[in-house]
Amino acid sequence: MLHYLQNLFQALDVSSLTDAVLRVAAVFLCLTVHETCHGLAALALGDPTAKSMHRLSLNPLHHIDWLGLALMFTVGFGWAKPVPVNPNYFRKPKQGMAVTALAGPVSNLLLAILFLGIGKVIYLYAPYSAGINVFFEWCLFTVAPMSVGMGLFNLIPIPPLDGSKVLAMFLPNSAYGQLMRYERYGILVLLALSWLGLGGNFLGNAIYGVYEALFHIFFA
């Protein structure tokens, strides 16, 4: 994932431009599902903040952070506009935040499974055509691996990624407060790790392993 999108616009022929458009569409889809599911989880736990601010939307423009999107296409990772969550609505704030955070990565894994399933149905039943073949490849080789990558990347326990909020559930309140105090510096840490090339191979192998396992469930 860290370097998946870096060479997106290198060539200018029609086929590569088509591929670029399809990849951008996949990014928008994965980000939108991820952020919307954060809001839905919060709502299910009693927090209406995202709903009242019209963030329970499948319109990607409601979720795109343009700086985060630009970084995604330059350094290989970025972020969306965070869905607002007020933990004061939760009966158990730390646990509520953890469940709300976990909803995003889980939704990405489920989205990958869904699109692998769609690909399987196309493979079994759809008549061949150029358009159907493009959609088939988009489901299997763009949306599914990108969604797996987005889900696993967000499980890294570095603030402000979702994994840090899941980790916080298991920390004492004092340690939780310390972790959240440094949340604003998390993006700088991630940028430094990306620039230094640290962790990329491990994450890439994890993404490939999960994607390959899911792929073989449908195409053994």
What do these predicted regions represent?
Residues M1-A220:
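Hydrophobic transmembrane alpha-helices and their immediate loop junctions
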